[in-house]
Amino acid sequence: MARVCQVTGKAPMSGNNVSHANNKTKRRFLPNLQNRRIWVESENRWVRLRVSNAGLRLIDKNGIDAVLADLRARGEA
């Protein structure tokens, strides 16, 4: 399973660890993904999402129905 948020599309980024001596080594910045079951009142069922913390905030802000409609329009749910 890819480390990608189903709501926002956030995926791992690459960057550098930088030591005190300014030595650089490659690293990955992973999104803060959570597996969540969210109750959808209109469908009277639970929906499982692999969602980032930013995605959870979007669900709180816009509502699960609007977020699911957007996912279905993109063909992802």
UniProtKB/Swiss-Prot annotation:
Gene Ontology cellular component terms for the protein in this record: cytosolic large ribosomal subunit
Keyword field contains Transport: no
SUPFAM superfamilies: L28p-like
One GO MF term attached to the UniProt entry: structural constituent of ribosome
InterPro entries with a match to the protein in the record: Ribosomal_bL28, Ribosomal_bL28/bL31-like_sf, Ribosomal_bL28_bact-type, Ribosomal_bL28_sf
This protein's UniProt keywords: Ribonucleoprotein, Ribosomal protein
Species: Paraburkholderia xenovorans (strain LB400)
Keyword set includes Ribosomal protein: yes
GO biological process: translation
Organism placement in taxonomy: Bacteria, Pseudomonadati, Pseudomonadota, Betaproteobacteria, Burkholderiales
Name this protein carries in UniProt: Large ribosomal subunit protein bL28
Gene: rpmB
